[in-house]
């Protein structure tokens, strides 16, 4: 199928949810494409933590993020779904002709006609929160890093982690045995990280393998073309210290933006898209799945994103062809996989 022919389902987002949506579309015999602003499939997993282990994916005691993406991409693309990477969706229009009409998704350089849409955009376009101090841009990728793509780059380094969430605490654990020393500072004494990981870091501190300080923030960065020292400040006592540091890794969350999707008339709750029990939005023909969605009891997990992708795609297929059952049956009995029905 030509890349710009009318497709049954266009999926916005190439992370785990979008990849599983593409797989399910193919399994249901629907033509599909994935459009993503990032240059590679995998979403946040590849953009932010390809070398981190994930422990809560069914069937894997643990799996590296990059390996999960590799396998999900192989699964997703086996039925001919096309990928359009580095493409930011800038517009949407409706063409009311033919069998009930269709949508056209527009990017800066292309147009993609589609019968239905599944938005699996995660948190949307994202940018790491900066420290907000003078001159930090001078040291970016020269001792100041806002993500960890390869932990080996910190081998033998004196590392300062900044933050109180899962990423900061996870790397305080995962850089053990790699970094020469690890200090983790946070501006408060409460943490958003998982309690088990917080306990791990406290235990590492008791063993002298990590230093955890609360109520401390980065005040200034120092160096000559490359980061050499950091001044930190205690917000309670106003004490300051200047430390010899090789790498500062602020893990303070992200600014996110759904971009043009916000202009489509979709019902939203804060930055999330409201969906019903079949993952349908308030706009007929547009579904959503994964972290971008909001509904009562919503959990933002890879596992739930996969389930939501199934629900969205099966209902999209049914909306295109009302004779198609919503429930696809069991994949173990499907001829499409080379199996014959019993």
Q: Which residue ranges define each predicted feature?
A:
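FAD-binding core/adjacent interface of flavoenzyme oxidoreductases
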Residues: 1-12, 27-28, 32, 40, ...
């Amino acid at each position: 199928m030509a890349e710009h022919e009318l497709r049954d389902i266009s999926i916005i987002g190439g992370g785990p949810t979008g990849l599983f949506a593409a797989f399910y579309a193919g399994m249901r015999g629907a033509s599909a494409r994935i459009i993503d602003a990032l240059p590679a499939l995998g979403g946040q997993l590849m953009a932010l933590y390809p070398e981190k282990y994930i422990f809560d994916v069914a069937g894997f005691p643990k799996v590296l993020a990059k390996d999960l993406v590799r396998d999900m991409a192989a699964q997703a693309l086996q039925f001919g779904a096309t990928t359009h990477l580095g493409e930011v969706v800038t517009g949407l229009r409706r063409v009311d002709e033919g069998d009930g009409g269709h949508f056209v998704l527009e990017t800066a350089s292309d147009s993609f006609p589609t019968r239905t849409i599944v938005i699996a955009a995660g948190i949307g376009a994202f940018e790491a929160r900066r420290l907000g101090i003078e001159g930090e841009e001078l040291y970016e990728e020269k001792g100041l890093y806002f993500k960890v793509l390869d932990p080996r780059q910190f081998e033998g380094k004196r590392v300062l982690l900044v933050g109180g969430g899962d990423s900061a605490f996870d790397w305080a654990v995962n850089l053990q045995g790699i970094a020469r020393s690890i200090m983790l500072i946070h501006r408060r004494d409460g943490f958003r990280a998982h309690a088990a990981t917080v306990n791990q870091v406290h235990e590492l501190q008791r063993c002298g393998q990590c230093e955890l300080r609360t109520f401390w923030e980065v005040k200034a960065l120092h160096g000559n073309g490359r980061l050499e020292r950091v001044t930190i400040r205690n917000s309670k006592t106003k004490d300051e210290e200047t430390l010899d540091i090789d790498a500062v890794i602020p893990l303070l969350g992200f600014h996110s933006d759904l971009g043009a999707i916000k202009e489509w008339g979709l019902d939203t709750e804060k930055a999330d898209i409201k969906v019903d029990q079949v993952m349908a939005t308030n706009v007929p023909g547009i579904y959503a799945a994964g972290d971008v969605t909001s509904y009562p009891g919503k959990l933002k997990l890879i596992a739930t994103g996969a389930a939501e992708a199934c629900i969205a795609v099966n209902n999209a297929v049914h909306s295109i062809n009302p004779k198609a059952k919503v429930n696809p049956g069991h994949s173990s009995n499907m001829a499409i996989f080379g199996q014959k029905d019993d």
